[in-house]
């Protein structure tokens, strides 16, 4: 009996062009897979994902960028269905970390082979994330970038302008981190929480070799002013971030972030939203079944 799959395509993703849904359907048919395609707007992905997750298909496939994949994955957490990935976004960090090919035909070949593993998922105040979450500088950059894009600016131009503006006006955060029976008071421009550990060397910066170690990795830069942040960016590109004196890296399975404010802007997998403080993070080990290439 052929596999039955449902494909959720984010029509607004970076690489979605006219005819892509027909191409996807044709490639699945060639692989002997019965695929039902849903092309949806970004605002409706969570609703469609919940509906499809409750259906009768064997596999639910997210076709889009990391935000799309994260939303679909959230509907499948701790459930029996497998997640398939078609990387159609701009960066596609999640699919790259899993070793999934970046072209659609090859990614469909991986789905057809149906080799699955279980991976961890992060959780902040009940919201899941597959890559990372952060507070401070980055979510404010994303918010301003989206405002500029709505005014007709290109994505990369808007991101660069928003980053420069935030470097000029962003206040430092004063936070208290509670983890592993310890409390750390910090003044920082950001707190970055990864689902498992990120590589910091020059050739693999921003990559994750494993997504099944059951840890949150926490990164922050203690207050040194904005020139300190510029220095950090340069050191990041040189693969020297861990040698930065005021850069901190922690690992835990649960983290609470307290602050004076009652609400704060939070990024999860590149999507931003306001959340109530305190922020309660935890790792959910082996919570998601995902299709990946077989290990050689």
Feature roles, as predicted:
Residues 1-60, 70, 296:
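ATP/NTP phosphate-donor binding region
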Residues 8, 17, 22, 27-31, ...:
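Catalytic core of DAGKc-family lipid kinases
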Residues 61, 84:
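Short aromatic-hydrophobic micro-motifs that form the base-stacking/packing surface
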Residues 62-66:
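N-terminal glycine-rich "phosphate-gripper" loop used for MgATP/nucleotide binding
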Residues 68-81:
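Short Gly/Thr/Asp-enriched flexible loops that form oxyanion-binding sites at enzyme active sites
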Residues 134, 192-206, 272:
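Glycine-rich phosphate/pyrophosphate-binding beta-alpha loops
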Residues 149-157, 202-228:
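Gly/Ser/Thr-rich active-site loops/lids in small-molecule metabolic enzymes
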Residues 179, 185, 210, 220-296:
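ATP/nucleoside-binding phosphotransfer catalytic cores, i.e., glycine-rich phosphate-binding loops
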């Amino acid at each position: 009996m052929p596999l039955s799959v449902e494909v959720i395509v984010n029509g607004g993703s970076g690489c979605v062009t006219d005819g892509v849904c027909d191409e996807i359907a044709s490639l699945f048919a060639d692989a002997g897979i019965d695929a039902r395609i849903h092309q949806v707007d970004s605002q409706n992905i969570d609703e469609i994902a919940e509906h499809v997750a409750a259906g009768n298909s064997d596999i639910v496939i997210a076709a889009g960028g990391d935000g799309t994949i994260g939303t679909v994955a959230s509907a499948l957490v701790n459930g029996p269905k497998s997640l398939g990935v078609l990387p159609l976004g701009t960066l596609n960090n999640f699919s790259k970390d899993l070793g999934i090919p970046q072209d659609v035909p090859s990614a469909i070949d991986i789905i057809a082979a149906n080799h699955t593993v279980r991976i961890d998922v992060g959780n902040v105040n009940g919201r899941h994330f597959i890559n990372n979450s952060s507070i401070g500088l980055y979510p404010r950059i994303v918010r301003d970038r989206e405002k500029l894009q709505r005014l007709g600016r290109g994505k990369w131009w808007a991101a660069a302008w928003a980053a420069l503006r935030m470097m000029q006006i962003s206040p430092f955060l004063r936070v208290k981190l509670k983890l592993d029976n310890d409390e750390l008071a910090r003044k920082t421009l950001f707190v970055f929480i990864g689902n498992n550990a990120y590589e910091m060397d020059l050739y693999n910066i921003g990559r994750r070799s494993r997504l099944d170690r059951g840890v949150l990795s926490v990164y922050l830069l203690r207050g040194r002013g904005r020139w300190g942040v510029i220095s950090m960016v340069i050191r990041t590109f040189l693969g020297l971030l861990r040698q930065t004196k005021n850069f901190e890296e922690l690992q835990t399975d649960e983290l609470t972030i307290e602050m004076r404010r009652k609400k704060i802007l939070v990024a999860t997998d590149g999507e931003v939203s306001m959340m109530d403080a305190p922020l309660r993070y935890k790792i959910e080990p082996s919570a998601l079944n995902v299709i990946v290439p077989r290990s050689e």
